[in-house]
Design a protein with these regions (language model features):
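Regulatory N- and C-terminal appendages and interdomain linkers associated
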Residues: 1-16, 148, 243-250
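ATP-binding glycine-rich phosphate-binding loop
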Residues: 9-31
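A glycine-centered beta->alpha junction motif in the catalytic cores
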Residues: 81-95, 131-139, 222-238
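A cross-family kinase active-site recognition segment
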Residues: 93-145, 152, 161-162
Length: 250
């Protein structure tokens, strides 16, 4: 149905202008019920959209500032690949203090989602120690040496508690800050994983030090290399993942 589905939000629902969006959606500002909102049209499955909608509603109820789904006139949270969500005011984080606030918000996200079910079709970084595919990741498409490096980085996360991670919070465009709150937007990459992946932030906003920072940075670079393979960005991220020392004969 495409954008014609916007009519399910009311006869006065209209598109306004395109917005920068995630990798999986056509994103526009829209007006629904006389209020500014955001419409995202993509090819995600109903199960995927239901997972995201339930997550955002849960986080909103628990006091996090997130875009929440606006129902259609008959009460659906999405229809024909279209989800309409509330518009978030604010600008991107710029200073170390801003990024510390982002880290605090991420840690609250992680606390609120311990034990959350995995996003349909996704796998965590530690799942990929054995599996080869999961949504946008296909390790079989990467050189074996690159896969070995990524898995070595993820192996350091084994045994850690899992929760929902935002998946791309170090992109300033995915955060909206005002004096009173921090809003996380663009949940395309959210899934269940180890929280370390969310905490490699500009200005080291999460204040990780020593081995904790190294583990998180290596695992995060490996994840972004795998999920984006094989464009220039993914190769830059792979270059940050340490090579595995060659075995030596004794």
């Amino acid at each position: 149905m495409g954008w014609e589905a916007l009519g399910l939000w009311g006869a006065d629902a209209v598109r306004i202008e395109p917005l920068a969006g995630g990798s999986s959606n056509d994103v526009w500002s829209v007006r629904v019920g006389g209020k500014l909102a955001v419409g995202r049209l993509g090819k995600r499955s109903d199960a995927d959209l239901a997972w995201e909608a339930e997550l955002l509603q849960h986080l909103d109820r628990e006091g996090l500032t997130v875009p929440v789904p606006i129902p259609t006139t008959d009460g659906r949270l999405f229809a024909d690949g279209l989800m309409v969500i509330t518009y978030m005011e604010g600008g991107p984080p710029r200073t170390k203090a801003d990024w510390r606030r982002v880290a605090e918000t991420l840690r609250e996200l992680h606390r609120l989602t311990r034990g959350w079910p995995q996003r349909p079709g996704w796998r965590s970084s530690t799942d990929l120690l054995d599996a080869e595919t999961g949504t946008r990741i296909d390790l079989a498409a990467m050189p074996p040496e690159a896969v070995a490096r990524c898995r070595a980085a993820w192996a350091r996360l084994v045994g850690r508690e899992r929760c929902v991670v935002h998946g791309n919070p170090n992109n300033p465009g995915n955060v909206r800050i005002t004096a009173g709150r921090v809003a996380l937007i663009d949940w395309d990459e959210a899934h269940v994983d180890v929280p370390d992946l969310d905490l490699v932030l500009p200005h080291n906003g999460a204040d990780l030090v020593g081995e904790a920072y190294d583990i998180a940075a290596q695992a995060s670079s490996a994840w972004e290399a795998a999920v984006c393979w094989d464009d220039d960005y993914s190769k830059e991220r792979l270059a940050e993942v340490r090579a595995i020392p060659a075995a030596t004969d004794r």
